[in-house]
C-alpha cells in the first residue's frame, strides 16, 4: 500500500533493526489505515540477521559427505529431497545411488516403465511420491523441453513439490535464496522469535518463511 504525501513513511532501516511489516490489500489515508484482508506482521528478531554467518561457517566445517552433495543439479537435489521425506538419511543413501544409476536424467524418469520405477522405490514406501515424481518429470519434458525449471513458482507448480522442496531445489541447485523450512527450522526460528504460536499451522509456517527469506545470504544460499 502507498503512503500519502506528507505522512510519515516507515524508516528504510526498519528491517535491519528487527521489524518487518508485511501488509496486503490495504488503503492508507492521512488519518487511518483501512484493512481489507488479513495482515501478517512479522517481528524479526535481530538474531536472525546474525545467525546465517555462524550457521554457514559451522556447516562448511562440519557438513556430512552425502551422495546428493556431489555433482549437484536440480534433478539430483529433487530426487534426494523426495526420498528423504519420512525416511532417515542413512537409509536413503543406497536407494539414491541406485536410482541415479538407473535413471540419471529427467528424461529417463519420465520414460521409465512403472514396474521399474516401483522396483527402484521398493523399501522406501509411500509410492505416491515416486508416481508424482514421474508426473513432474513428464511435465518438465513436455513444457520445459526436458530442462528443469529455475523459477521458484514454476518448480513449486510441479506435481508433488511444495514450498520446502521448491526452496531446497532453488537454494541448493541454483543458489537462489529461498527458504526450505522443515520441522527443525520451525522449532529453532520460533524460539529465536520468542513465539508461542503453533508451528503446525500453515499460517505460522508462512510467517516464518517470510521472516527468514530476507536474511538468507545470497552468496551462500546453496549452503
List PLM regions with ranges.
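Catalytic cores of DNA base-excision repair glycosylases
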Residues: 35-49, 53-223
Amino acid at each position: 500500500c502507498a503512503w500519502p504525501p506528507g505522512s510519515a513513511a516507515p524508516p528504510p532501516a526498519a528491517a535491519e533493526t528487527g521489524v518487518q511489516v508485511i501488509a496486503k490489500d490495504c488503503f492508507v489515508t492521512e488519518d487511518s489505515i483501512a484493512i481489507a484482508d488479513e495482515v501478517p506482521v512479522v517481528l524479526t528478531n535481530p538474531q536472525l540477521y546474525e545467525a546465517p554467518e555462524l550457521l554457514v561457517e559451522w556447516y562448511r566445517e562440519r557438513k556430512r559427505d552425502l551422495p546428493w552433495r556431489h555433482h549437484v543439479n536440480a534433478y539430483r537435489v529433487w530426487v534426494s529431497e523426495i526420498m528423504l521425506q519420512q525416511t532417515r538419511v542413512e537409509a536413503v543413501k543406497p536407494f539414491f545411488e541406485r536410482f541415479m544409476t538407473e535413471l540419471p536424467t529427467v528424461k529417463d524418469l519420465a520414460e521409465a516403465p512403472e514396474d521399474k520405477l516401483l522396483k527402484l522405490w521398493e523399501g522406501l514406501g509411500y509410492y505416491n511420491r515416486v508416481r508424482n515424481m514421474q508426473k513432474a518429470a513428464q511435465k518438465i519434458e513436455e513444457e520445459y523441453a526436458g530442462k528443469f525449471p529455475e523459477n521458484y513458482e514454476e518448480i513449486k507448480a510441479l506435481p508433488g513439490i511444495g514450498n520446502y522442496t521448491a526452496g531446497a531445489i532453488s537454494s541448493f541447485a541454483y543458489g537462489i535464496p529461498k527458504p526450505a523450512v522443515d520441522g527443525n527450522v520451525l522449532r529453532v526460528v520460533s524460539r529465536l522469535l520468542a513465539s508461542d504460536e503453533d508451528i503446525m499451522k500453515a499460517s505460522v509456517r508462512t510467517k516464518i518463511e517470510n521472516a527468514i527469506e530476507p536474511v538468507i545470504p545470497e552468496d551462500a544460499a546453496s549452503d
